[in-house]
Swiss-Prot record:
Residues 144-288 form a coiled coil. Disulfide bonds: none annotated. Residues 92-123 have a biased composition (Polar residues). It comes from Homo sapiens (Human). Keywords: Coiled coil. Belongs to the CCDC160 family. The gene is CCDC160. This is Coiled-coil domain-containing protein 160.
C-alpha cells in the first residue's frame, strides 16, 4: 500500500518540464505571460505559507494540550506514590515530602520547557511511556466512563481524519490547478532556471506537507483501530457482566424457591408433631376421665353400702336391748 501511494505521489507531482527542456525551447514568451506566471507563483507561495502556518499552529496547540494532560497524569501518579511511601515509612516523611516537591518542580520545569519547544518534546517522549500512562489512566476509570471517553476520542479522530482528507483533496486540487497554469503558459528564457528551481522547491514543500498529512492520516487510522478494539473489548466485558448478573439472579431465585419449600416442609413436620402430641394428651385426658368416673361410682356404691350397714346394725341393737329389758 505504501509503495502504491509513493508511486501515485511520484506520478502526481512529477514536473512537466526540466531546465534542459526549457533550454531547448525556442519560443519567445510575451511580457504579459511573464507577469502572470510571477503573480501565480507568488500567490501560490502565499497560500502555501498561510496554510503551513495554520497547520503548524494547530499542531503546536494540540501537542501542548496533549503534553499538559500527560504531565498532569504523571504528576498525579508521582503524588500518589509519594503519599503511599509516606504512609508506609512514617520516619522518612521529611525526605519523602522533599522528593515529592522535587518531582513537582521537575514536572513543572519539564512542562515549561515543552511549552517553549513543543515540537521536540513530543518526539522525545517515548511512545511506550505514553501508552503505559494512558493504560493506567484508563484502568482507573469505570467501564462506562471509559467507553464514553473512547467514543469521544473516536469522534474526534474521525473529525480530524475528515479534516485532513479535505485538506489533502484541496492541496491536490491546488497542485493540479497550478501545474496546468504553469504548463499552459510559456516561460521566459532568462528566468527559466530561477522559476524552475522555485517551482521544484514549492512542489517539494507540498510533497513534504502531503507526506506529513499522509503520516497523520495513517496514525489517526491506527488510533481509530485501537479505539475500536478497546470498545469491542469493553462490549464483551459488559456482555459477560450482564450474563453473570443474570446467572446470579437465577441462582437467587432458585435458592429462594428451595428455601420456601424447605420452610414449608419443616412447618408441616412441626404441625404433625404438635397434632400427635395433642392426640396423645387427649387420649390421656379421656383415660383419666374414665378412671375418675369409675372411682366415683365405686365411692357411691361404698357410701350406699356403708349407709345400709349402719341401718341394719342400729335395728339389731334396738331389738337386742328390748329383749334384754
Amino acid at each position: 500500500m505504501d509503495a502504491r501511494r509513493k508511486h501515485w505521489k511520484e506520478n502526481m507531482f512529477t514536473p512537466f518540464f526540466s531546465a534542459q527542456d526549457v533550454l531547448e525551447e525556442t519560443s519567445e514568451p510575451e511580457s504579459s505571460s511573464e507577469q502572470t506566471t510571477a503573480d501565480s507563483s507568488k500567490g501560490m507561495e502565499e497560500i502555501y505559507n498561510l496554510s503551513s502556518r495554520k497547520f503548524q499552529e494547530e499542531s503546536k496547540f494540540k501537542r501542548k494540550k496533549y503534553i499538559f494532560q500527560l504531565n498532569e497524569i504523571e504528576q498525579e501518579q508521582n503524588l500518589r506514590e509519594n503519599k503511599r511511601n509516606i504512609s508506609k515509612n512514617e520516619t522518612d516523611t521529611n525526605s519523602a515530602s522533599y522528593e515529592s516537591s522535587n518531582v513537582d518542580v521537575t514536572t513543572e520545569e519539564s512542562f515549561n520547557s515543552t511549552e517553549d519547544n513543543s515540537t521536540c518534546s513530543t518526539d522525545n517522549l517515548p511512545a511506550l511511556l505514553r501508552q503505559d500512562i494512558r493504560k493506567k489512566f484508563m484502568e482507573r476509570m469505570s467501564p462506562k466512563l471509559c467507553l464514553n471517553l473512547l467514543n469521544e476520542e473516536l469522534e474526534e479522530l474521525n473529525m480530524k481524519y475528515r479534516k485532513i482528507e479535505e485538506e489533502f483533496e484541496n492541496a491536490e486540487k491546488e497542485l493540479l490547478h497550478y501545474k496546468k497554469e504553469i504548463f499552459t503558459k510559456p516561460l521566459n528564457f532568462q528566468e527559466t532556471e530561477t522559476d524552475a528551481s522555485k517551482s521544484d522547491y514549492e512542489l517539494q514543500a507540498l510533497r513534504n506537507d502531503l507526506s506529513e498529512k499522509a503520516t497523520n492520516v495513517k496514525n489517526l487510522s491506527e488510533q481509530l483501530q485501537q479505539a475500536k478494539e478497546v470498545i469491542h473489548k469493553l462490549n464483551l466485558e459488559n456482555r459477560n457482566l450482564k450474563e453473570a448478573v443474570r446467572k446470579l439472579k437465577h441462582q437467587t431465585e432458585v435458592g429462594n424457591v428451595l428455601l420456601k419449600e424447605e420452610m414449608k416442609s419443616y412447618y408441616e413436620l412441626e404441625m404433625a408433631k404438635i397434632r400427635g402430641e395433642l392426640s396423645v394428651i387427649k387420649n390421656e385426658l379421656r383415660t383419666e376421665k374414665t378412671l375418675q368416673a369409675r372411682n366415683n361410682r365405686a365411692l357411691e356404691l361404698l357410701r350406699k353400702y356403708y349407709a345400709s350397714s349402719m341401718v341394719t346394725s342400729s335395728s339389731i341393737l334396738d331389738h337386742f336391748t328390748g329383749d334384754f329389758f
